[in-house]
């Protein structure tokens, strides 16, 4: 590489660092006062801003609003509120297949005790995988009202592609599903000696307790297993109709699996939930509907109304009348980050979409087996 090329590359790196230094001042939410030197637009890897109030079109309109609702869901779980999305004002995103979204929105709480005024919220959602539901919300806060659970000031701002997708700096390590007392003591010693961050030990405790809420998503349970009332709570129709997050989970599974639906809101409007079961770490909790509030849960949703699901290398039976299944895992981390991971069940794995099933033919269901809990 020539001296001139080295100089140009170093100049580009300098501009890049300066962009992210400025973006970090607002945790990636407010970019209005950030300017780039002439000729560097399109060269610097940065966030792309979208003004939803002025622009008639912007990427993934349905999905971005679902991400905004997901952030409010996290806030409501932590604070016991009922905030709902009123208006998506703006968002910034990375130009990647797997992106991070920094959203500013207006929300209101319909509870009369909360008053009728709207609040401005900031929500950050990071995608962890392309073509399926795997997202994390690390920031969901009223603007200028952050606290430790909503955004950590202990670690520097890290954009997604730098490997710091979690805005509150949670350090992810590979941990077995069940740690022995000896292993926990060794981790505790390493933390005391300053060899590991303190939250690694906390993560280990969660891993030990997490069990079925780690690793791959479970298969759809058999009817006999679902009838185990100690293990599964069958959500009443009145409850899921009053609980907007269950339908939001379903819409997120479908839209993240097929992002083309993000410009087709009419597809989601046809969805009809048939039944819902929830599995939590706490069994026989009284009253049973308290399990709806669990920080760690598997939500099993049977639904219809999706005429032609699309998923990577899979085809499904066609028809809105077909009952389909989706599984969503919810895990609230010990520092307040909320993760959702989900999948559509069924379909046949093939190489080419030209082999699509005709209407009326039976699709392969998720393998039915008892889960180990």
Curated annotation (Swiss-Prot):
Source organism superkingdom: Eukaryota
N-acetylthreonine sites (modified residues): 2
Family annotation (Pfam families): protein_MS5
Tagged with keyword Acetylation: yes
Keywords: Acetylation
InterPro entries the record matches: MS5 (IPR006462)
Keyword Acetylation: yes
Sequence similarity: Belongs to the UPF0725 (EMB2204) family.
The protein's name: UPF0725 protein At1g23950
Organism listed in the record: Arabidopsis thaliana
Organism phylogeny: Eukaryota, Viridiplantae, Streptophyta, Embryophyta, Tracheophyta
